[in-house]
Amino acid sequence: MRYSRLFGKTQREIPSDAETISHQLLLRSGMIAQLTAGVYSFMPLAWRSIQKIENIIRQEMNKSGCQELAMPVLQPVEIWQQSGREAPFGQTLFHLKDRKDRNLVLGPTHEEVITDLASRYIQSYRDLPQRLYQIQTKFRDEPRPRGGLIRVREFIMKDMYSFDASPEGLDESYQTMKQAYENVYRRCGLESMVIDADSGAIGGKASHEFMIVAESGEDSIIYCPKCNYAANAEKAVFKKKTLPKEPPKDLEEVATPGQKTISEVAAFLSLKPENTLKAVFYMADGKFVMAVIRGDLDINEIKLKNLLKCNDLRLAEDSEVKAAGIAAGFASPVGLKNSLTVADDSVENGSNFVAGANKDGFHLKNVNFGRDFKADKMADIALAAEGAACPFCDGTFASKRGVEVGHIFKLGTFLSERFGANFTDAEGISHPIIMGCYGMGVGRLLAAAIEQNHDEKGIIWPMPIAPYQIYICGLFLDNPAVSQAAEKIYTELEAQGVEVLFDDRELTAGVKFNDADLLGIPLRLTISPRNLDKGGVELKLRRNKESELVPLESIMERVITCIKSQSDL
């Protein structure tokens, strides 16, 4: 491909609304173009990379015994009502009506459609197992699209669904897909981690996320370096600090003027944060909820939402807290009425805590769970953090940032029961089909690759998913020797099947080198009068600072060797 014919242009300035590195570089390199919030066009360079990612995915899916199909994006809302997932997805669903006033949605995922198909075409144990997948555009009305391709409203996704006759069959399908996903990321040249995850609105009994490790990632990964336990911070469990038990003392009100935060109160009263309690207020499906936790811990809102089994959970607004008769900054679980109280199990681990007095400028000393307040629900609702104790060994948690690029779930019979997707066994007895679902974000994977592979100059594409394998930079192309050598090398490389982007533009060396670094093509071949006078051309790997002079007669062999060494992942 000649650069002079390439559709799209690079930008020097960093777009003001681009927060993540991948968003900045995708826009600056002219690889994507925004149409509206969370909706992008893939320009030719990015689309070449997308196609390569999809090809790797297809190869691994097909190798794992999967069959590709295509399902409709337009779905009747009734199937979402039948599954019971219309409410959990809530405003994320794009709703529309057709000309006959029928309610439809744009598919954010396809569990409902595939289960409906299974109910029609799987009748016997002889029809099992089945593994079906598609690569298709999906739609989710994200409240805050951000991060370029990281969180969008229209996106490309590979979704696969497994159907088995037994839990053991599901386990086999699940492990097969887990390995296939790891193969995809490895072949794309990316470092990934498999971690325990929350199932969210998809549902199911177990799930794992696949994270591409990147400092700018939006997800927090909690892991134990000693035993290799790893989980999303939303899901992670940990060993909470044990406090000594003391005999309960009498409640005592103390003045704490202007001391509203846990750290302020602890310092003022010469306590440690773990000797305090804090109350956080939420609205859960419109119902007022107080969550109580030890002062050294934070609320995990995903755990809380799962415990309450609510579709919508948000922090209560100041007006809602005030209407409940609560003094903000001095809130107390003691004596509070007309609210659902949820306590983290840490409140049982300790005694004589300090908590708010629900009175401006005052706190209560010697607050004890059971005597002074009770909970309607008690569970682990604490957020794991770096430095927490691992519950599976004597290690201590560390943390990394990552971008989620895949999520797999053991659905079980959750959906098959609702859709009547049953099979008869060898004895003629009917059973619900046991399902799994497996999602992989293709656009997210593209963005994550950049988050993991870049420097201050631009993108550094892994060879397997680079738009082109080599960038030919012709300098002083008005020089006949340079233009002839460049054209000859370009033609011969293409004839060998090498993917070449030939910068044939009449621009300065500085502009061409800057664009080469920004676009991140893995190899750069520079043809200039000075190099030709030395009997060769300059070859440089984008990932390295050093370059080498390659004799003209050795170019083909050297380039192909470099491509192969960078592709064998």
UniProtKB/Swiss-Prot annotation:
Assembly information from the UniProt record: Homodimer.
Matches recorded under InterPro entries: aa-tRNA-synt_IIb, aa-tRNA-synth_II, aa-tRNA-synth_II/BPL/LPL, Anticodon-bd, Anticodon-bd_dom_sf, Pro-tRNA-ligase_IIa, Pro-tRNA-synth_IIa_bac-type, Pro-tRNA-Synthase_IIa_type1
Record bears the keyword DNA damage: no
Gene: proS
SUPFAM superfamilies: Class II aaRS ABD-related, Class II aaRS and biotin synthetases, YbaK/ProRS associated domain
UniProt keyword terms in alphabetical order: Aminoacyl-tRNA synthetase, ATP-binding, Cytoplasm, Ligase, Nucleotide-binding, Protein biosynthesis
GO biological process: prolyl-tRNA aminoacylation
Catalytic activity line of the entry: tRNA(Pro) + L-proline + ATP = L-prolyl-tRNA(Pro) + AMP + diphosphate
Cross-referenced CDD domains: ProRS-INS, ProRS_anticodon_short, ProRS_core_prok
Annotated protein name in UniProt: Proline--tRNA ligase
The keyword Cytoplasm is annotated on this UniProt entry: yes
Main location (coarse class): cytoplasm
This protein's domain notes: Consists of three domains: the N-terminal catalytic domain, the editing domain and the C-terminal anticodon-binding domain.
Similarity comment: family membership: Belongs to the class-II aminoacyl-tRNA synthetase family. ProS type 1 subfamily.
Enzyme Commission identifier(s): 6.1.1.15
Single GO molecular function: aminoacyl-tRNA deacylase activity
Biological role: Catalyzes the attachment of proline to tRNA(Pro) in a two-step reaction: proline is first activated by ATP to form Pro-AMP and then transferred to the acceptor end of tRNA(Pro). As ProRS can inadvertently accommodate and process non-cognate amino acids such as alanine and cysteine, to avoid such errors it has two additional distinct editing activities against alanine. One activity is designated as 'pretransfer' editing and involves the tRNA(Pro)-independent hydrolysis of activated Ala-AMP.
Any GO CC annotation of this UniProt entry: cytosol
Entry's localization field: Cytoplasm
